[in-house]
From Swiss-Prot:
Disulfide bonds join C101-C193. PANTHER family: MITOCHONDRIAL TRNA-SPECIFIC 2-THIOURIDYLASE 1, TRNA 5-METHYLAMINOMETHYL-2-THIOURIDYLATE -METHYLTRANSFERASE. It is an enzyme of class 2 (transferase). One of its GO terms (biological process) is tRNA wobble position uridine thiolation. This is tRNA-specific 2-thiouridylase MnmA. It catalyses: S-sulfanyl-L-cysteinyl-[protein] + uridine(34) in tRNA + AH2 + ATP = 2-thiouridine(34) in tRNA + L-cysteinyl-[protein] + A + AMP + diphosphate + H(+). Its main location: cytoplasm. The keyword Transferase applies. It comes from the Bacteria. The gene is mnmA. Pfam families: tRNA_Me_trans, tRNA_Me_trans_C, tRNA_Me_trans_M. One of its GO terms (cellular component) is cytoplasm. It comes from Corynebacterium kroppenstedtii (strain DSM 44385 / JCM 11950 / CIP 105744 / CCUG 35717). Residues 143-145 are annotated as: Interaction with tRNA.
Length: 372
């Protein structure tokens, strides 16, 4: 099989490429250059698109004896990932750019070019499994990345390889050390690659500018002001800019963001509890149109799952949670799973477009305990 190994410069993609070579596939290594200018490359940072990462990926490819290429997808990355990220915050949403990058860059732009060049598949170092054409959770629950792959469609999955899905992370590092790969002890990346200092608010402020609005309590009283809704996300507690503590002394959290009026509403933790989600922009859920199923839903990359009743109607998923979630924001992905003893199966995903608080639902719609 002719395989493109997407090599980020980290230990996971390095071992994935090494395994493919050992299995006898015809492999080339590809590193994606996503920064638009040299100043945005994160020299020395722990990420997936810095100059250091590119060099590490090249050294691994040389050690494996495979061709290595750097493909410039910076324009596509700006258009399909960075700009939508900014626009989403302008609309009061909280997007995950890594999911968008997987959907539009790593498994669309890269795959399209690879197929045009005669390759059969793209392989990455993601922790997930493909079995009988179904995307499943990885063996290593602590590293499972099926959530961030829930945005892939059937055609993309048909050309994917995830060589690490049956292995735990500590064993991957041991394998890299045994093979003498330079990335064996390299730390994992956790930040957003195009925000090198991790200051999302400053990044958005530089692109959007000041757009003042009001901070209100649950009764609609103005209790403060802000410079832009992009500085807030649902569930946020710190940095609200309130002039003083709440009268009852309880912490205050962001409970709603209204992009039309520029209003940010705050309340107690109880006000954050939601019992129903609505999701649109559905992926791989068309076959379930008109159906109601008992499933599980995950709304954060490193969050837990909750049981839910999912109804698909007219391209929108209504997700009734069996126990409440807190801090759920519009723009997050809701990935739907079907429990399975051989690894939970990803049925598909949608983008959360609305939520309903527990207080607005019948008491029996969602349970009494909260999950984060």
């Amino acid at each position: 099989m002719r395989v493109m190994a997407a090599m980020s410069g980290g230990v996971d993609s390095s071992v994935a490429a090494a395994r493919l070579v050992a299995e006898g596939h015809e492999v080339i290594g590809v590193h994606l250059a996503l920064a638009s200018t040299p100043t945005t490359l994160r020299v020395g940072s722990r990420g997936c698109c810095s100059l250091e990462d590119s060099g590490d990926a090249r050294r691994v490819a040389d050690a494996l004896g495979i061709p290595f290429y750097v493909w410039d997808f910076s324009d596509r990355f700006r258009e399909d990932v960075v700009d939508p990220f900014i626009n989403s915050y302008e609309m009061g949403e909280t997007p995950n750019p890594c999911l968008r990058c997987n959907e539009k860059i790593k498994f669309q732009a890269l795959l399209d070019r690879g197929i045009a060049l005669g390759f059969d598949a793209v392989a990455t170092g993601h922790y997930a499994r493909l079995k009988d054409g179904e995307l499943r959770r990885a063996i290593d629950d602590n590293k499972d990345q099926s959530y961030v792959l829930g945005v892939l469609n059937d055609e993309q999955l048909a050309h994917c390889l995830f060589p690490l899905g049956d292995t735990r992370k500590p064993d991957i590092r041991k394998e890299a050390e045994a093979a003498g790969l330079v990335t064996a002890s390299k730390p994992d990346s956790h930040d957003i690659c195009f925000i090198p200092d991790g200051n999302t608010k400053a990044f958005l402020g530089n692109h959007i500018g000041v757009r003042s609005g009001d901070l209100k309590d649950q009764d609609g009283n103005v209790i403060g002001h802000h410079d832009g809704i992009y500085g807030f996300t649902i569930g946020q507690r710190k940095g609200l800019g309130l002039p003083g503590p709440a009268p009852d002394g309880k912490p205050r959290y962001v409970t709603d963001i209204d992009a039309d009026t520029g209003t940010v509403t705050v309340g107690t933790r109880d006000d954050l509890r939601v019992g129903r989600l609505y999701a649109d922009r559905l992926i791989r859920l068309d076959e379930h149109e008109g159906s109601t199923q008992e499933c599980q839903v995950q709304v954060r990359a490193h969050g837990g799952v909750v049981d839910a009743t999912v109804t698909i109607d007219d391209g929108v998923a209504t997700i009734d949670l069996h126990s409440p979630l807190t801090g759920v924001a519009r723009g997050q992905a809701a990935v739907i799973y079907r429990p399975d003893p051989d690894g939970d199966i990803v049925l598909g995903s949608g983008t959360i477009c609305d939520t309903v608080s527990v207080s607005k639902l019948q008491p029996t719609t969602a349970g009494a305990s909260s999950n984060s």
